[in-house]
Amino acid sequence: MMPSHTSMVHGLLKDSNPIPILSPSGVCCSAAHALEYCFLSVLSGHTNNAICGGSELFSPLLRSNIFEEEYKAISQIQSNPYIAFEKDFLRWMLSDGAGCALLSDMPSDGISLKIKWIEAVSYANELDVCMSQGLQNTASGEWTSWKAMRPVDWQTQSIFAIKQNIKLLAEYGVEKSVLHIANSCKKHQLNFA
């Protein structure tokens, strides 16, 4: 959706200057990607400081009434409760929140934290889509964007509801997290033994 959250925040700062902005999208890692971008900008000398902010307001998208039309349209809910669980799971896992941090090439007079490195990677080349919004998985395994669907199907199929592939998360979530941590520790010569 447009404009980006970052652009809207910058638009509210009427006394500020034109600045570089970035709006990573996603749920789980977007704030970490923003922090990495700010860190690399300051580290490289491109900027002297950067403000990293993260803000999530997903609760309006997780209310049960968002799924009512789909539940009415799907007669198999009783025989296949996984359909409901796939979406209801997220109602318990995601929450609203916001925060920000100022990164600078100089320590502050008070308490300062130092970032030595940030490692963020994607496994999208190896794994199927794990979390989605605005997509529909077809019977053949293809993904269809809401832009290619009829508007009448958007609500009956809860296209804009956030969906989590619980099976994929259960199978690979811990494995890929541990692999990434191990690779990062090796790269940065951290030994916890």
Model-inferred region functions:
Residues P3-H10, I66-E70, C130-L135:
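Short, flexible, mixed-charge acidic loops at enzyme active sites
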Residues S25, G53, A193:
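Conserved residues at the C-terminal ends of beta-strands
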Residues N80-N191:
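Condensing-enzyme catalytic core mediating Claisen C-C bond formation in acyl metabolism
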